[in-house]
C-alpha cells in the first residue's frame, strides 16, 4: 500500500490503517512511502494489484525523466520478477477515472501497452470482476 503517489496526496496514518487492516490477516502487506513503481520494486518477486488506469500510466513516458525511460522501468520489473494483476476500469479517453470522467471500460488487452509490459501482467477479466468506483470515490 502506497503512502505516497505521484498523482495523489500523501495518506494519513488513519488512512493507512483503514486500508491495510482488512488485508493484514490474510495477505502479506507492504506499506511504502515510495511514490513510483520502480521505487517500490526494491524487493524481488512482488505482485502489485492495480487498475487499468495505473498500468496505463506505468507505460507512459511522461511518468519518467530523461535519464530513466519506460523501457528502463520495464527492464527493472522484469529482472526483479515484478508482476501486476490488472483490473479493468471505466476510463475517459485521457485514461482518467472517477465520477466526473466517465468513458468506456478498458481492460489490459485494450490499452495498447508495450508487449514487454503486458507480459508482466495478469488480467482480471470484466466477467470476473467489475466495479466502476474509483479509489477517490471510495475514500
Regions found by a protein language model. Name each.
Residues 1-139:
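Nucleotidyltransferase catalytic core that binds NTPs
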Amino acid at each position: 500500500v502506497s503512502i505516497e503517489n505521484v498523482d495523489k496526496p500523501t495518506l494519513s496514518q488513519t488512512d493507512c490503517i483503514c486500508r491495510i487492516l482488512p488485508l493484514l490477516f490474510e495477505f502479506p502487506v507492504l506499506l511504502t512511502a515510495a511514490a513510483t513503481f520502480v521505487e517500490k520494486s526494491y524487493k524481488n518477486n512482488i505482485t502489485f494489484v492495480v487498475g487499468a488506469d495505473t498500468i496505463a500510466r506505468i507505460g507512459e513516458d511522461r511518468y519518467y525523466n530523461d535519464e530513466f525511460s519506460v523501457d528502463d522501468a520495464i527492464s527493472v520489473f522484469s529482472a526483479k520478477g515484478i508482476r501486476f494483476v490488472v483490473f479493468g476500469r471505466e476510463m475517459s479517453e485521457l485514461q482518467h477515472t472517477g465520477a466526473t470522467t466517465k468513458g468506456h471500460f478498458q481492460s489490459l488487452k485494450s490499452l495498447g501497452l508495450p508487449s514487454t509490459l503486458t507480459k508482466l501482467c495478469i488480467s482480471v477479466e470484466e466477467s470476473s470482476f467489475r466495479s466502476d468506483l474509483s479509489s477517490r470515490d471510495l475514500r
